[in-house]
Amino acid sequence: MFMVLFGTVVIAGIVGYISEKSGFTQLVLASSGGIDSAVVCKMACDAVGPTNVHAIRMPSIFSTSHSRDDALLLHQRLGCWDYEVEVEHQSVVNMLNTRFSQHRDDPANLVTAKLKAQAYAGVADENIQARIRDVYVMHFSNAYGAMPLSTGNKTESACGYYTHFDMNFSYAPIKDLYKYQVMEIARGAAEIPDNIWQKPPSAELAHGQIDEESLLSYAILDPIVRAYVEDYISTFARFDRWV
C-alpha cells in the first residue's frame, strides 16, 4: 500500500511540473522493455493520459527479442504511442575509428597506439549506444514538442551506474526511488507485463550483460546505498554479510 501511495505522489509531481513549470503537454521517453522505463511509462500515462505519451523503442544488436516484445506489449496495454528506431551503433563506431586514425603513421599518436595494441576500450562501444538513444529522444523532444523523461533510479545514480551525458532530460520521475521500490511499483501495476519485473535487470549494451553482475544483488546493494545516502553512515562503516 505504501508504494502505491508513493507512486501516486510521483505522478502528482509529474503533473505539477508539467502544469506549473515546463509548458509541455506531451511526454517522451526511451522504453527498453526493462523495469525502470516500464514504471516511468506507466506513471507518465497516469499523469497526462496515454495519448499524450510517446514511448520510443530503440533496440540494438544486443537487445533481446523478449525485451522488444515486452516493451511493445506494455505500450499496447497502456495505450500510449509506440515508435521503434534501430540503434546502428557499429557504423558510427567504425566511422569514428576511421576519422580518428588520421595520424595512423605516427606511433606517438594516442589513437594509433591504442588500436595497434588492440587496447580499444569496449566500454566505449557500450556507452555510445546509450548516447545515440539520448540523441533520438532529444530530437523527438525538440522537433515535436514533448518533454523528455529520464528513467534512472536512485540506486544507479548513487553508484554511478549510468552513461555520462545520458541523463540529459527535463524530469526524472523515479530519481528518488531505489531499485527495490521500482520493483514493488512494477509488481503492483497490472499493465506492466510480469516478465518485465521477473527477468534480471540489464542495460543490454553487450551480450549477456546483467546489472547485478556489474554491481551487487539489489537486495544487498539497496540497503547499503540507503545507509550511505539517507542515514549518512561513514564510508568506513562495515556491513554484515547478510545485509
Protein language model regions, located:
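ATP/NTP-dependent adenylation/nucleotidyl-transfer catalytic domains that generate, transfer
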Residues: M1-G33, S37-V243
